[in-house]
Amino acid sequence: MALDIHAHRILILDFGSQYTQLIARRVREIGVYCELHPFDMDDEAIREFAPKGVILAGGPESVHEANSPRCPQAVFDLGVPVFGICYGMQTMAEQLGGKVAGSELREFGYARVDVVGKSRLLDGIEDHIDADGLFGLDVWMSHGDKVTKLPEDFHILASTPSCPIAGMADDARGYYGVQFHPEVTHTKQGGRILSRFILDICGCEALWTPSKIAEDAIAQVRAQVGTDSVLLGLSGGVDSSVVAALLHKAIGDQLTCVFVDNGLLRLHEGEQVMAMFAENMGVKVIRANAEEQFLNNLEGESDPEKKRKIIGRTFIDVFDAESCKLDNIKYLAQGTIYPDVIESAGAKSGKAHVIKSHHNVGGLPEEMNLKLVEPLRELFKDEVRRLGLELGLPYDMVYRHPFPGPGLGVRILGEVKKEYADILRRADHIFIEELRKADWYHKVSQAFVVFQPVKSVGVVGDGRRYAWVVALRAVETIDFMTARWAHLPYELLETVSGRIINEIEGISRVTYDVSSKPPATIEWE
C-alpha cells in the first residue's frame, strides 16, 4: 500500500497576519503537510480535514472589539493540540474563559521573554540562562493587546515586563499560546518551538519530504491522466520547468510542451530550454518562433499595462494555434502553486478553493475543452525548487532569479523594439555573468538590467557617442513583498559598467538603482 504523505497533517487558521504563509512554510520544512484556511472555516470541513493539530495564526484585529474574528468551536471539540500565535493566543484565551485587554505599552520588534513555567512546549529550549537560572528567549513581538487573565487550567509559560502573560500552557489538553512569532527568523528558537509542537506534542511523522512528494505527485498524475495526452506551455521558468520534468517522468511521451519564443527572452534562453528538455531529457517540445508577431503587435505601444495585455493575448493566440495542430489532447498542465491557491480562495470565504488561471494561458482550458493537471498546487515556491532538484534539474535552473511573464517587454521602458531588446539582452547577460564570477548571484534575490529610452552623451576614444542609458537593478528580499537594494561592491559595479559600455555599441551610460520596495517596486514597469 502506498504511503499517504498527507496522513499526518496540521490545520492553520488565518486571521489576517502577514506571517501566516510563513507559518505554513515552516511546518512544511519540518516535514509535515499542512493547509492554510480562513478563520471561519466550516465546522464540517474542519472535522473532515481531521488534523493532528491546529495552529491559530496572528492577525491585525483586537479580540476585545465587537465582531472580531473567532476560532470555530469545532477546533476545540476535536480533542487535538492547539497552538495560538499572537492574535491566535488572544482569541484562544478569550474563548476559553480568559480575558484580553489593550496594552499601554505595545511591543513591536525584538524582545526577550523569560520562560517562567514548565511545559512540554518550551522545556529545554532557551537562548539565555541568567545568574538565577532563569531561561530566556530572543523573540519577535508584534502586538498591541495582551492576555490579562488566564483561562481555567492554564498556567503562565513566559512573560516580559510589559506583558506578564507572554505565553500560556495547558499541557493536559495540549493547548498552548505565545504572544511572540516563532515562525519568523528573528525568533532564534522558533523552528525548535514549532518542531516541538508538531512532532512531539501533536505526534506527527515527518512524511513530507522532496523524494516522497515526487513519488506521490507522479502517482497522482498517472492516476488522473491514465493514457491520455497532456499539453504544457513551457516558459523556461522554475514552475513550468519542474512541471515538465515531473510530467515527463510520470507519463513520458504522453506529454507535449509548447515553448513560445516571443523575442523577449534572455540571451540564448530559447536554445537553453530546448537543449535541457528536448535534447537532454527527451521531452517532446514544439518551439514556436513568434518574435515578429509579438513585436508587430507591440509596435507603437508604450503603456505598461497595455503592453502586458498585448503580450498575454499574443501568447494565447500563438499557443492556441500550435495546440490546434495536435490531436487527442485531453489535459492542459499548469504551474499553479499553493500561494496561487490561497490568493484565489477569496477573503475569508471558508469555501472551496478557486484556482487562479496561469497568466499565460488565461481562459484556454475552457476554450479548448481541456481538463487541468496542476501537480504543484500544494507546494510553496521553495518546495517547488527542492522538488526540481529531486527530479534532476540543474541547481542553476531551479534557483534562477525570477523573470516576469512578459519578459523583456516590461524591462524596456516605453515602446518595445527589436533593437532595444537585442541591446538589453546583451547588457543583462553581462551583468548576470559578472555577478556569478564575483559569487554574488545567489547572494541577491533578483538582478537584471532595465533599458531606458533616453540617450546620453559619451566619449569613446577621440569620438563623441550619443547612445542609450541602462540601469542595473539588484535586490535582497525574503518574500518579494518588501525588498532592499543590494549593496554590491563598487569594484563589481565598475566592472559591469565598463564591460557594458565597451562591449555594446548602443549604450553610453550605466546607472545603478538604489530604490527599495516600498516605495519603489522591484520591476520598473
From Swiss-Prot:
User: Which InterPro entries would you find in this protein's record?
Assistant: Class_I_gatase-like (IPR029062), GATASE (IPR017926), GMP_synth_C (IPR001674), GMP_synth_GATase (IPR004739), GMP_synthase (IPR022955), GMPS_ATP_PPase_dom (IPR025777), NAD/GMP_synthase (IPR022310), Rossmann-like_a/b/a_fold (IPR014729)
Q: Which residues bind ATP?
A: 235-241
Which leading EC class covers this enzyme? ligase
Domain GMPS ATP-PPase: residue ranges: 208-400
Active site positions, chain numbering: 86 (nucleophile), 181, 183
| Domain Glutamine amidotransferase type-1 residues, every copy | 9-207
Task: Could you list this entry's UniProt keywords, alphabetically sorted.
Answer: ATP-binding, Glutamine amidotransferase, GMP biosynthesis, Ligase, Nucleotide-binding, Purine biosynthesis
Pathway the protein takes part in: Purine metabolism; GMP biosynthesis; GMP from XMP (L-Gln route): step 1/1
Q: What EC number(s) does the entry state?
A: 6.3.5.2
Mind telling me which GO cellular component terms the entry cites? Answer: cytosol
Report which reactions are catalysed by this protein: XMP + L-glutamine + ATP + H2O = GMP + L-glutamate + AMP + diphosphate + 2 H(+)
Quaternary organization: Homodimer.
The task this protein performs is described as: Catalyzes the synthesis of GMP from XMP.
HAMAP family in the record, alphabetically?
GMP_synthase
Annotated protein name in UniProt: GMP synthase [glutamine-hydrolyzing]
What gene is this protein a product of?
Answer: guaA
